Design a protein with these regions (language model features):
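Conserved SAM/SAH-binding loop-helix junction
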Residues: 113
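Short cysteine clusters
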Residues: 107
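Conserved G/P- and acidic residue-centered "switch" motifs that form tight phosphate/ATP-binding loops
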Residues: 110
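Cys-dependent protein tyrosine phosphatase-like superfamily
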Residues: 1-104, 116-166
Length: 166
């Protein structure tokens, strides 16, 4: 698990999926609990989570009182709806305004989709350029933003959210 420094009062973390194949020592869930995680953003679908962990992760999180948001992105791919994706970026920024928030973002390995999300979040919430956002996230998560398509999405993020002219 990686702590992502940010200027907001809340804490921002990134990780692999608990109980999944990248949670090698099966300790992430205990780490979530010891770190006081209050919010989880899942970038995996329920089906992907269930296939990897053999349980309903969203239900587990909710049963322990966590706020759960889901914005599934297929593995190694990019978001298909920039408007909904941008709304999720802002939802995370809003949640981090609360000093009692500890929010973790995860996909399967915690690198590709998680890195993509955080690099776009850094552009929206921190005002970083696309190139600086990519460097920023890779400083915290080695190997973040795994595919060329994901990298291109990050680098062209500002163009995807500009108002469209007729």
């Amino acid at each position: 698990m990686f702590e992502i420094c940010n200027p907001f009062p809340g804490r921002l973390l990134a990780s692999a999926m608990p109980f999944g194949p990248h949670d090698l020592d099966q300790a992430l869930w205990d780490l979530y609990r010891s770190e006081g995680v209050t919010h989880v953003l899942m970038l995996v679908s329920d089906a992907e989570a269930r296939a990897a962990t053999r349980q309903d992760l969203a239900a587990l999180y909710r049963a322990h009182g966590l706020t759960v948001w889901q914005h599934p992105i297929p593995d190694f791919e990019v978001p298909q709806d920039p408007t909904a994706f941008r709304a999720m970026l802002h939802q995370v920024a809003d949640a981090l305004q609360d000093p009692g928030t500890t929010l973790v973002v995860h996909c399967a390995a915690g690198r590709g989709r998680t890195g993509l999300f955080l690099a776009c979040w850094a552009q929206e919430a921190l005002g970083l350029s696309p190139e600086a956002a990519l460097q920023w996230v890779r400083r915290y998560i080695p190997g973040a933003v795994e595919t060329r398509a994901q990298e291109e999405f990050v680098l062209t993020w500002p163009l995807r959210v500009l108002p469209q002219t007729p």
